[in-house]
């Protein structure tokens, strides 16, 4: 599934809302805790979208590369990053890079829209010489139920999304790396609409090895 210009703009507009900013902050905190990027590391973000996570990693001193199949999203990423990232069109299942090219490879809400998630994971492992981060929409979360219910009444890009759970995700990873050391956690536990008044409650919930947050990494 390739996103059009309207989807790209809607995503960036959502990030400007109070709920979008809070959810984005929580997700990025989990991503940084798990990846622990270091200055000078080479990082590839597969399915980089409009470049939000490339900016995050660039600010941590990484040398960033992004790959994205959507031309409109890639155009926005170029506007945001200028010459501070190498950006390529392409698909997660066919990465145009040699083996062991990057210290870190991330796929953040990318597997949901790939034709072959296992192949995409295998490609990420192939081009990484260090860490691979998989960030997904969690099928075992309250928000996943809300999204699926909402699809019955209005069109949604989530209708074609493939949600994941931790056991399916780790199973795919172990097809390629049977002895991999896997660290994981999740965030965003509350229903949509609660984040105007229940931020304190969200932040009391344990994150690491909690399988019920809407964003799982």
Short names for language-model regions:
Residues 118-132:
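A short glycine-rich, Lys/Arg-flanked "PGG" loop and its adjoining helix->strand segment in the class I
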Residues 106:
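A conserved beta-strand element that flanks and buttresses the S-adenosyl-L-methionine
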Residues 44, 50-94:
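Class I SAM-dependent methyltransferase SAM/SAH-binding core
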Residues 1-38, 52, 130-160:
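Conserved class I S-adenosyl-L-methionine
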Residues 109-112:
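Short catalytic micro-motifs in class I SAM-dependent methyltransferases
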Residues 181-217:
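A C-terminal cap/extension of S-adenosyl-L-methionine-dependent methyltransferases
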Residues 160-185:
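Short alpha-helix
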């Amino acid at each position: 599934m390739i996103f059009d210009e309207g989807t790209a703009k809607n995503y960036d507009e959502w990030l400007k809302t109070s709920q979008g900013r809070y959810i984005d902050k929580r997700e990025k905190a989990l991503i940084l805790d798990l990846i622990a990027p270091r200055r000078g590391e080479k990082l590839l973000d597969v399915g980089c979208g409009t470049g939000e996570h490339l900016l995050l990693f660039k600010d941590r001193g990484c040398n960033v590369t992004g790959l994205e199949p959507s031309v409109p999203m890639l155009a926005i990423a170029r506007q945001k990053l200028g010459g501070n990232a190498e950006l390529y069109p392409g698909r997660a299942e066919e990465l145009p890079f040699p083996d062991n090219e990057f210290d870190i490879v991330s796929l953040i809400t990318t597997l949901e829209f790939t034709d072959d998630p296992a192949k995409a994971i295998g490609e990420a492992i192939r081009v990484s010489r260090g860490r691979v981060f998989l960030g997904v929409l969690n099928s075992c979360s309250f928000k996943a139920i809300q999204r699926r219910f909402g699809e019955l009444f209005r069109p949604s890009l989530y209708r074609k999304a493939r949600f994941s759970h931790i056991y399916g995700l780790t199973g795919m990873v172990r097809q390629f790396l049977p002895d991999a050391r896997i660290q994981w956690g999740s965030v965003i536990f509350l229903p949509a609409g609660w984040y105007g008044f229940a931020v304190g409650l969200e932040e009391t919930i344990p994150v690491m090895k909690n399988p019920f947050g809407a964003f799982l990494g």
